[in-house]
Amino acid sequence: MQLQRELEEYWGMHMLVFATGWMGGFGVIRALVRPWDHVIMDHVSHNCLQEGAIAATRNIKKFEHLNQDEMERMLRETREADPDNAILVVTEGLFSMDADSPDLKFYQKTAKKYNAYLLIDCAHDFGHLGPTGKGTSFPI
C-alpha cells in the first residue's frame, strides 16, 4: 500500500500495483477488455500484453511494428464495422528489443478520432526517459 500511495503521489493519479510487470500488462488488458471488445496492437508488443488480449477477446488485430497508417486503417475499419463496442489500441512507450518508440501523440489523436482507448506500456521507459523522467508517455 505504501508503494501504491507513493506512486500515486509521484504521478498525480490513481495507481494499481501488481506483483510483477508481466502480471501488470496481462491484468490491465484482461480487466479493461470485454469479450465483444476489440484490441488493436503493435505486432511486437510484449508477450504479457498479447496474452492479456488473447485472454480477454477474440477480436485482436496486430499492425506492423510502428506502422501508423496500418494502425489507423485497422482502427477505422474496426470502428466502421462495430460502432458500439470498445476498441483498445495497445503499444509501448519504448520497445525493449529495438529501443524504438511510436509517435504517441499521433496514437492518442488517432484513438480519440475513432472513439477508442489507448494503452501505453511504460515498463521499459518509466523512470529514465521523457522530459520529467516519467517515461515517454507522460505527458502526451
Predicted regions and their residues:
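Conserved N-terminal alpha-helix of the aminotransferase class I/II PLP-enzyme fold
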Residues: 1-21
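Short, structured coil segments at secondary-structure junctions
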Residues: 11, 55-57, 114
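Conserved PLP-anchoring active-site segment centered on the Schiff-base-forming lysine
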Residues: 28-47
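Catalytic P-loop NTPase motifs of RecA-like helicase/translocase cores
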Residues: 47, 97, 120, 125-127
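Active-site-proximal loop->helix
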Residues: 47-56
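Active-site phosphate-binding strand-loop segment of PLP-dependent enzymes
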Residues: 61, 65-119
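Conserved active-site segment immediately N-terminal to the catalytic lysine
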Residues: 114-115, 134-140
